[in-house]
Amino acid sequence: MAPCPQPESCPAGSPLGLICLSLLLIPASAGTYCECSLGLSREALIALIVVLAGVSASCFCALVVVAIGVFRAKGDTCPGHSENRLVGPYGVQEDRIDLHTVHVESHLMDPDLDVSMMPSLDGPGLMTMTAPLEPPPPPPPPPPLPQ
C-alpha cells in the first residue's frame, strides 16, 4: 500500500499540490486506499488534474509561439542583415508591390448587357465645377467671464 499524507497535510489549491496529489492518486486508482480528501471524489480530482494539465500545455504552446516570434523579430533587426523592406506607419512592409491582374466574372450580370453599351464617364453629361476659395469667417468673440 502506498504511503499517503494525513488529512491536515493535504495541499489544497496549489497546482503543484494537485500534481503531487495526482501522483498519490495513481496507487489509489489501482485499488489501494488513501485517507487524503479535499472534499472531492477521486474522479473529480482526476478530472481537475486533467484540465489543469491541458491548460498548462496550452500556456506552454502559447509561450513557445511568442518566443519564436520574438526570436524572429530580433533576427530581422540585425544590422548586417539587409532586406528589401521598409518600416512604414503600419509596421514592416515590402518595398515592391506585386499586382496581379484579377479577372472578375459575375454570374448576376445580364448577358445582353454589353460593356460597349455602358456610357463613358467622359461624356458630355458631366462637367467640372470650380468653386472660388473664400477666406473663412472670423471666429466668434469669446463669452464674457462671469464675475
UniProtKB/Swiss-Prot annotation:
Residues 32-47 are extracellular. The chain crosses the membrane at residues 48-68. InterPro entries: TMEM210 (IPR028123). It is found in: Membrane; Cytoplasmic vesicle, Secretory vesicle, Acrosome. It is a single-pass type I membrane protein. GO terms for cellular component: acrosomal vesicle; membrane. Pfam families: TMEM210. Residues 128-147 are annotated as: Disordered. The keyword DNA repair does not apply. Residues 1-31 form the signal peptide. Keywords: Cytoplasmic vesicle, Membrane, Signal, Transmembrane, Transmembrane helix. It comes from the Eukaryota. Residues 133-147 have a biased composition (Pro residues). Residues 69-147 are cytoplasmic. This is Transmembrane protein 210. It comes from Mus musculus.
